[in-house]
Structure formats: C-alpha cells, structure tokens
Amino acid sequence: MMGGPMAGHLLRHKFRVFGHDLDPARSREFARRGGTVCPDTAAVARQAKIVIVMVGYDHEVVQVCAGPAGLIENMARGSTLVICSTMKFETIRRLERAALRKGLYLIDAPVCRAEEGAIAGNLLMLGSGDRRAFERLRPVLRTFCTDIFHLGKVGAGQVAKICNNILLWISVVANCETFG
C-alpha cells in the first residue's frame, strides 16, 4: 500500500525504477506509470544498485531478503539495501549481518505517516546504518520523505519507530478515554 506511491515519487523524479509485486494489478499500475516490472526479487536485485523494501510484515521482509532467491544473495557487492518496513530489532540485525557478509550496505529506514504520507510524499524516515551510505541515499529518499533522520547503527531506526508507535497509540487511547 505504501510501496506503490513511494515508487511513483521516484518515477516522477526521473529515477529508473525496477519493481516486483505479488499482486498483478499493482504490477500493471506500476508499469503504466513507467516502472519496469521484474518477474521476481532476484531480478530486481540484479538490476539495481539501490533496492528499497516496503512490505507489511517482518516475515515478508525476511522472505524478500533472505535465501537463494532473495535480495541479499543476488545484489552486487557495494549495493545498498534499504528496508523501510517496520520489523523486529533482532531481524534487522540478522539481515544486516547477512548483507555485510555479501559486501552490501543495509540501511534500516522505517517510515511514519502511513499510506497518506506515502501518497503525499511527506513520510518521516527514522534511518540507521552506515552514515556515508545513508547520506548518499538522501536524493532518493527526498522524493518521498520530507523529514529524514539518521539515528546511528542498524536497529536504531526500528527502536525509534516502535517508540513513535507507542506514543501514537497512547494518544489514540487517551482520545478514546476523553471523548468516550
């Protein structure tokens, strides 16, 4: 739900974007907007020096990134893997170790402001990972984020996102209590 709008912003800023989605309708829409649809994640990995992952759940990130057909195994040495999904701290650290073994940069970069923020191009990014690799990404990230923070080592982004979510849900509960 968020990956499509994020890819759309990249396309509008004239980036060449390769993508893979299990939903044929989303793939058709991506192609209609100028994206190149790949048959699988391995094909995306072989085409791009920067790969952005935006899937819904922790296990989906692992499915896309790990294993023989995953991004980590198929990306070229020196490439950057950017994970924008919200996931477990332990999982992002495990993926970082796998990426480092393959000579990749892994940037932990969960985003806030939901689908509306992705559509508007005003996401908040709570990034972490190699500082130089992160800074090289800024022109890409600015296409769909208005607020971009680097918070330290891989995992710090996920911790900050969980803190953000806790504060959000505290506010929701407080409003429900207040207004009944």
Segments and roles (model prediction):
Residues 173-174:
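Glycine/proline-rich active-site loop of Rossmann-fold NAD(P)-dependent oxidoreductases
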